[in-house]
Amino acid sequence: MSLHQFLLEPITCHAWNRDRTQIALSPNNHEVHIYKKNGSQWTKAHELKEHNGHITGIDWAPKSDRIVTCGADRNAYVWSQKDGIWKPTLVILRINRAATFVKWSPLENKFAVGSGARLISVCYFESENDWWVSKHIKKPIRSTVLSLDWHPNNVLLAAGSCDFKCRVFSAYIKEVDEKPASTPWGSKMPFGQLMSEFGGSGTGGWVHGVSFSASGNRLAWVSHDSTVSVADASKSVQVSTLRTEFLPLLSVSFVSENSVVAAGHDCCPMLFNYDDRGCLTFVSKLDVPKQSIQRNMSAMERFRNMDKRATTEDRNTALETLHQNSITQVSIYEVDKQDCRKFCTTGIDGAMTIWDFKTLESSIQGLRIM
């Protein structure tokens, strides 16, 4: 595991370029900083300044090498690099509340933006007018959209929101998409069609993170009531929900067709397994804490603790986990959702950690990525 402390401020969100030599992140303000890897060091290469509100989402398209950002100023920008300089293009989102999340589609010909306006803007490039325009998915969303993920077919879109529900919509746009083939989620896919809806029957919480599996047949989401859920469209949309004993999880990603990594307020990534029988189980925490050493205190330390912390005990305030505060985002670092070898986490502590499954499997007894 490699940990890099980028900032003292929280990292709101991040995105990697195609070959993982650069990372774009927001230091909890209206800027995007792009860091470049030089040996074992990360050096700041660019600062993207166009937003005038907090940046809430970043995504970097691997093939076209374009960055999309969205923010609390209700705007989104598509950034393209020309002669080593990143130039922004404004996107017409048509929203009256903050944008909360942004994600490129797999073919990179459109992207989706969630917002506090209780809608999703699906944006595509209109070449005759030379600008990015959007279509809105509104019904039946009743609250802020917190998270989005695209199905591999480039048409279906999963959305988690503050009305305690996780939904799958069709984001088919005839101007840029070919007619989609039938999927286990459904066959008729006009724009805005609600394909599936989960949660919200008296229980649940805000849906913080959603993730399709590599096949697109499974959908995982994490909610503020400390639950992890997986829906399997190939098993007539059977839902398995696991109520965990942990603090709420904020981000989730499939790392194989049967394995899910999630992380959040416990400052530690966790591995869950979903087997072919439809059973969802907790496997292990992936951050193995070092054993704390008991030691005797001097009288001087005892009095200092009484003065500073109103206690006579030697309480170390550092957490045993690598991250010292909540993890806000999990992303795939090496390979893909089908066969992830390494994944990355960033958090409120301003740190970025890269986790290697091979190293984890050797240090955690019985750990295997299925």
UniProtKB/Swiss-Prot annotation:
A GO BP annotation: Arp2/3 complex-mediated actin nucleation
One GO term describing the cellular component: muscle cell projection membrane
Molecular functions per Gene Ontology: actin binding
InterPro entries listed in its UniProt record: ARPC1, WD40/YVTN_repeat-like_dom_sf, WD40_repeat_dom_sf, WD40_rpt
WD repeat start-end pairs: 6-45, 50-89, 140-179, 202-241, 244-284, 322-365
UniProt entry keywords in alphabetical sequence: Actin-binding, Cytoplasm, Cytoskeleton, Nucleus, Repeat, WD repeat
Span of the signal peptide: none
Primary localization: cytoplasm
Matches recorded under SUPFAM superfamilies: WD40 repeat-like
Subcellular location: Cytoplasm, Cytoskeleton; Nucleus
Keyword tRNA-binding attached: no
Cross-referenced PANTHER family: ACTIN-RELATED PROTEIN 2/3 COMPLEX SUBUNIT 1, ACTIN-RELATED PROTEIN 2_3 COMPLEX SUBUNIT 1A
Function of the protein: Probably functions as a component of the Arp2/3 complex which is involved in regulation of actin polymerization and together with an activating nucleation-promoting factor (NPF) mediates the formation of branched actin networks. In addition to its role in the cytoplasmic cytoskeleton, the Arp2/3 complex also promotes actin polymerization in the nucleus, thereby regulating gene transcription and repair of damaged DNA.
Similarity comment: family membership: Belongs to the WD repeat ARPC1 family.
Subunit comment: Probable component of the Arp2/3 complex in which it may replace ARPC1B.
Name of the protein described by the UniProt record: Actin-related protein 2/3 complex subunit 1A
Species the sequence originates in: Mus musculus (Mouse)
